[in-house]
Amino acid sequence: MLFNVLLRYFWRNYSTIENAAELQLRQDHVVTLESRPPNIEGKGEITIRDLVINALRMRPDRIIVGECRGGEALDMLQAMNTGHEGSMTTLHANSTREGLSRLETMVLMAGMELPHRAIREQIAAAIDLIIHLERLRDGSRRVVAITEVQGMEGDVVTTADIFKFEQVGFENGKVIGRLRPTGIRPKFIDRIEQAGIHLPASVFGVGERLRNY
């Protein structure tokens, strides 16, 4: 699971919220929260949204929501926009672009009468990166796109693909290909470098793109 790989690089003091605990956590000071369905009398339900709201009261550095399916998306965005950088969640969509549209729909499910532009502004401010996984025709799951959310242009959230999966063949029932840089240097790279992580421009194919011209 991609989440488990990414969480290995987290330090501590974060909260995870899931319908059923699946994440493998080894760090210190991690709070794991699980939702609970109602009993036979229809009482006692604890929703993902309830848990997001309560997790914020614990003052974690980051909040990890296993999957956003409804109104909790609004609380997640607000958490990301109020100092909880590095927070993550997942959702189901056919592309990174459709993922943004679905996220907007889920925010509306919170029951708040927010203008579409206001929701998109929150999305653009909160999210830096979208990783799109897809099941390929050989049944394997691969990262097929890593996309940066760059901001707003008018009423539209703007994005740019930083890496895209390129299929070069299909042999013995297996898809052959790899993730290739698009030649676009992400805007958030300065923040990464401020954290002490220095990536050469060649990682993003910037020099390669110039040579191709």
Language model features with spans:
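Hydrophobic positions on the alpha1 helix immediately C-terminal to the Walker A/P-loop
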Residues: 1-2
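Switch/coupling sub-region of P-loop NTPases
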Residues: 5-126, 132-134
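NTP-binding/hydrolysis catalytic cores, primarily Walker-type P-loop NTPases
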Residues: 139-213
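C-terminal helical "lid" of AAA+/P-loop NTPase domains
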Residues: 128-132, 145-148
